[in-house]
Amino acid sequence: ALPICTMNSFVTIGQCAITLIDTLNERIGRGVSWLTLAIVLVTVAVVIFRYCFNLGSIAAQESISYMHALIFMLGAAYTLKHNDHVRVDIFHHRFSKTTQGWVDFLGTLLLLMPVCLFIIISSWDYVSDSWEIQESSRNSGGLPGVYLLKSTIIIMAGLLFLQGISLAIKSLFSALGITPNTES
């Protein structure tokens, strides 16, 4: 169960938001990480069936691509939570904690969040058109539900936006010298 927070101050509200968002993205990230094992197992099965039994499956081959996409799309916010995205750090590490907090806060508000909103807005018609026709694979024997996979574009941007809220709050706390009591 997600933690329950009481809201009686700015810091407490911030801590609550951080905890809820970080917990959500942690669970999603850990969940989709198991897809890497599934990719390996399905790939091995596809190879064995193809070369040992001369049997092929378009659906199995497509499922590998679907799982790969899910790992990246649903794991992006988890990666941001753990600060594991590629980052060119020329100056940031030399700044004081306060300055780092302000840089991260402004970067989140001025770069990450607008990009997430742009992705959601610009992909909305693309995804809704796919839903409208219940798009499925173009290949005979392929997987149905391409529209579900395309929906992860919006979900990814939404999860990144939420994680951006958590990051912005953490950065603002750092910039203001506030040390919240969060376990995430």
Predicted regions and their residues:
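Short, small-residue-biased leader/transition segments that mark boundaries at the very start
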Residues: 1-4
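Alpha-helical transmembrane segments and membrane-interface helix-loop junctions
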Residues: 6-184
